[in-house]
């Protein structure tokens, strides 16, 4: 969603190091940190995400980006939330935005079903985007800027 050029690939855990990018819209800008994905037991040191969890402590908000092609998006969201909570319960008190990404890869009906599942689970609006086609990104950025201000 920013001008950063992180590696993009069709497999999990493409991000191996935090990537910072700047989002600019009109006269506003903000820094977005793309942190490597968390796996179950990351708070215990498993996977790459653990060593980057400290970066999340400094963030104003958390954007949960979930791959819409995941079979169980609810489990994916809950795994991330659980790991953040196990690392530091205060992190889960931050502003949250939930995003389903890669929406160019599956049909609209399946996206709608998964979006409803996550909205029921999180009680939050879920944004659907494709960072490849750009679909939905502008709406997401508008929401991020509203929360920031």
Task: List each model region and its residues.
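N-terminal, positively charged regions that mediate nucleic acid binding
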Residues: 134
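Conserved C-terminal guanine-recognition region of P-loop GTPase G domains, centered on the G4
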Residues: 25-27, 50-128, 138, 144-147
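Conserved G1/Walker A P-loop phosphate-binding module
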Residues: 1-46, 50-61, 66, 141-144
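Cofactor-binding loops of NAD(P)H-dependent oxidoreductases
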Residues: 11, 129-131
């Amino acid at each position: 969603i920013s001008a950063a050029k992180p590696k993009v690939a069709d497999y999990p855990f493409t991000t191996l190091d935090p990537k910072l990018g700047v989002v600019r819209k009109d006269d506003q800008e903000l820094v977005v940190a793309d942190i490597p994905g968390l796996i179950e037991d990351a708070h215990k040191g498993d996977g790459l995400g653990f060593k980057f969890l400290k970066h999340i402590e400094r963030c104003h908000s958390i954007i949960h980006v979930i791959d819409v092609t995941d079979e169980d998006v609810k489990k994916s969201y809950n795994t991330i939330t659980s790991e953040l909570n196990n690392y530091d319960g205060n992190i889960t008190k931050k502003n949250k935005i939930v995003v389903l990404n890669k929406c160019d890869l599956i049909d609209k009906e399946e996206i709608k079903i998964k979006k409803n599942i996550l909205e029921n689970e999180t009680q939050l609006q879920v944004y659907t985007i494709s960072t490849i086609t750009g679909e939905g990104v502008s709406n997401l950025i508008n929401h991020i800027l509203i929360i920031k201000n």
